[in-house]
UniProtKB/Swiss-Prot annotation:
EC nos: 7.3.2.1
Residues noted as binding ATP in the record, renumbered to the chain: G50, P51, S52, G53, C54, G55, K56, S57
Gene Ontology biological process terms from the UniProt entry: phosphate ion transmembrane transport
Official protein name in the record: Phosphate import ATP-binding protein PstB
Superkingdom, natural source: Bacteria
Domain ABC transporter per the UniProt entry, residue ranges: 18-256
Topological type in the membrane: Peripheral membrane protein
Family membership: Belongs to the ABC transporter superfamily. Phosphate importer (TC 3.A.1.7) family.
The entry's keywords: ATP-binding, Cell inner membrane, Cell membrane, Membrane, Nucleotide-binding, Phosphate transport, Translocase, Transport
Reaction equations catalysed: phosphate(out) + ATP + H2O = ADP + 2 phosphate(in) + H(+)
Organism: Prochlorococcus marinus (strain MIT 9313)
Subunit structure, interactors included: The complex is composed of two ATP-binding proteins (PstB), two transmembrane proteins (PstC and PstA) and a solute-binding protein (PstS).
Length: 272
């Protein structure tokens, strides 16, 4: 299978939350990922896996227009969310990022108190309810309330790495998104903190659609319902590699009976 001949995948979900339709993303003249068709199921966890440089983080950032912040980045095709093309001129990217939140690879709490890490974003987004209740609910949903409830006035930066990442998840939850994107959220964490994040993700999927990029295939098996495998190949002329979607299916099928040889080779460790 080549990047220029990737077939349109079969429909996986009858209730897609986000649909990528022939999406190609470029940085100036360089194509990073090409011709992606994919439907992200609602209320599930979808993992994006593949070797470094295959475009999975680029695709993840396209789902809430974070790539807009990168100079020279452009997208063709359509990213549909609840019937709207997110790249339509009349769509406000700030509102897109409120409805589709992001948790980054490195924990990045605000240099504020734990309380204000949660309250600040909600406040600037016009939240009018009981702020104390929102802070507690968000921290509980991110499974960090018990560790923070007695030190809400302390800096969020004083927490451990795993606690900081769960604080960032709580901060994302507080603005009441419909989708949460996670870009390798456990790569900087120890195994115990990773387990807590994964347990939190399982709880959150009852309320949110989650899309996660991970290099850890065991993590993809543990947490995701669906998996998209991306690969990359050298472009004509040898000017770099372009990423493309090889296969998208239920996680169990991807890891136990993949349809593509490249998927089997990757999950068995023959490359990557």
């Amino acid at each position: 299978m080549t990047a220029t001949s990737s077939p349109r995948p079969k429909q996986i979900s009858t209730d897609p939350c986000i649909s990528l339709q022939n999406v190609t993303i470029s940085y100036n003249e360089f194509e990073a990922v090409r011709h992606v068709y994919c439907e992200i199921p609602r209320g599930k966890i979808t993992a994006l896996i593949g070797p470094s440089g295959c475009g999975k983080s680029t695709i993840l950032r396209s789902l809430n227009r974070m790539n807009d912040l990168i100079e020279g980045c452009s997208l063709t095709g359509r990213v549909m969310f609840d019937g709207d093309d997110l790249y339509s001129p009349n769509i406000d990217p700030v509102e897109v990022r409120r409805r589709i939140g992001m948790v980054f690879q490195q924990p990045n709490p605000f240099p504020k108190s734990i309380y204000e890490n949660i309250a600040f974003g909600a406040r600037i987004n016009g939240y009018k309810g009981d702020m104390n209740e929102l802070v507690e609910r968000s921290l509980r949903q991110a499974a960090v309330w018990d560790e923070c409830k007695d030190k809400l006035k302390e800096s969020g930066c004083s927490l451990s790495g795993g606690q900081q990442q769960r604080l960032c998840i709580a901060r994302t939850i507080a603005i009441e998104p419909e989708v949460i994107l996670m870009d390798e959220p456990c790569s900087a964490l120890d195994p115990i903190s990773t387990l807590k994040i994964e347990e939190t993700m399982h709880e959150l999927k009852n309320r949110f659609t989650i899309v996660i990029v991970t290099h850890n295939m065991q993590q993809a098996v543990r947490v995701s319902d669906f998996t998209a495998f991306f690969n990359a190949e050298v472009q004509e002329g040898g000017s770099g590699k372009v990423g493309y979607l090889v296969e998208f299916n239920e996680t169990e099928k991807i890891f136990h009976s993949p349809a593509q040889e490249a998927t089997q080779n990757y999950i068995s460790g023959r490359f990557g």
